[in-house]
Curated annotation (Swiss-Prot):
This is RNA pyrophosphohydrolase. InterPro entries: Nudix_hydrolase, NUDIX_hydrolase-like_dom_sf, NUDIX_hydrolase_CS, NUDIX_hydrolase_dom, RppH. The gene is rppH. A motif (Nudix box) lies at residues 38-59. GO terms for cellular component: cytoplasm.
């Protein structure tokens, strides 16, 4: 679904483990890594799209995860001109995304990148929480930064608590 401004409705998914790490996936046959994401179909809610994409891209079902939170608003990024399909109607100039933070509740073995029969990723790994902001393709970086900042108090409760105390650790100096 592309809106009147040319932005395609999309959901982004951040899956975290109990150690505060996030799932980072490599695009099939490419050297680029990102969080799972995908379009919202007509008549589908953002949450329904998230669960569909969760299965299609990483093979997880609702019982494998717990939804911790979602972004308060839709976040947008523009595609670089070289990626815009000029002959496409309606013209899509970027994505507007609703993001979801999920906690993996099952074993890692439940992750199956080929579950849908059309894998979008060919590898994945756990990375530190802020790592994706530095590593994602440049045109998505601002959205990733905003999402990670919004989700940090939920995903990293101890870090968020430290930040409210001026970022200092208690204890003696060395």
């Amino acid at each position: 679904m592309i809106d009147s401004d040319g932005f395609r409705a999309n959901v982004g998914i951040i899956i975290c483990n109990r150690f505060g790490q996030v799932m980072w996936a490599r695009r099939f046959g490419q050297h680029s890594w990102q969080f799972p994401q995908g379009g919202v179909d007509e008549g589908e809610s953002a949450e329904q799209a998230m669960y569909r994409e969760l299965y299609e891209e990483v093979g997880l079902r609702p019982e494998h995860v717990q939804v911790l939170t979602s972004t308060r608003s839709w976040l947008r990024y523009r595609l670089p001109k070289r990626l815009i399909r000029q002959d496409s109607k309606p013209l899509c100039i970027g994505q507007k995304q609703k993001w979801f933070l999920l906690q993996l509740k099952s074993q890692e073995s439940a992750i199956d990148l080929a579950a849908s029969g059309h894998p979008e990723f060919d590898d994945w790994r756990w990375v530190s929480y802020w790592y994706p902001v530095r590593q994602v393709v440049s045109f998505k970086r601002d959205v990733y930064r905003k999402v990670m900042k919004e989700f940090a108090p939920t995903a990293l409760p101890f870090q968020a608590q430290e930040n409210t105390q001026g970022g200092r650790r208690r204890g003696r100096r060395r």
